């Protein structure tokens, strides 16, 4: 989504504004299976940094604004952080789902919450994965291990895309 360099200081005469909203839970059904890692507090939870309980629901919340000339999407994800490549994944999914919706921009933000599932791959068995990846680099054999959980990240991408589709 390229956005626009045009600055508009007045609404057009026939402008009709619309707003859409949607939200979804980012807590998977199997969250307590010992497979998900808590972001932000590795030293406090060492050596086990797995999610042990859920106090509050993690959510993605989306607002879509339309001024009659195009839609602008704002999605906020309750997570420690979200990488540029992850945002591109979400944008690609939205582009496929909503190709006829005249979306001008898709903006995705993280709340930087320190008590949620790790979306950056830093609060898991990091050194084990680092050692494995160094071995793969030097040997040229095997596959690299991602710090993030690909299954969870796809879940997050799907839920975020779903809220955008619903809000549009």
Task: Describe each region flagged by the PLM.
Residues 1-168:
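Conserved beta-alpha junction segments in alpha/beta enzyme cores
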């Amino acid at each position: 989504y390229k956005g626009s360099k045009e600055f508009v200081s007045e609404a057009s005469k026939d402008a009709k504004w619309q707003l859409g909203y949607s939200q979804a839970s980012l807590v998977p059904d199997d969250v307590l299976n010992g497979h998900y890692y808590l972001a932000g507090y590795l030293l406090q939870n060492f050596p086990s940094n797995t999610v042990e309980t859920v106090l509050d629901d993690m959510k993605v919340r989306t607002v879509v604004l339309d001024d009659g000339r195009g839609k602008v999407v704002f999605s906020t994800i309750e997570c420690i952080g979200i990488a540029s490549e992850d945002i591109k994944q979400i944008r690609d999914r939205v582009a496929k789902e909503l190709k006829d919706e005249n979306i001008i921009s898709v903006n995705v933000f993280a709340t930087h919450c320190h008590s949620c599932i790790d979306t950056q791959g830093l609060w898991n068995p990091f050194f084990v994965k680092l050692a494995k990846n160094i071995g793969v680099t030097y040997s040229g054999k095997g596959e690299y291990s991602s710090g993030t959980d690909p299954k969870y990240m796809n879940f997050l991408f799907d839920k975020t895309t779903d809220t955008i589709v619903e809000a549009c």
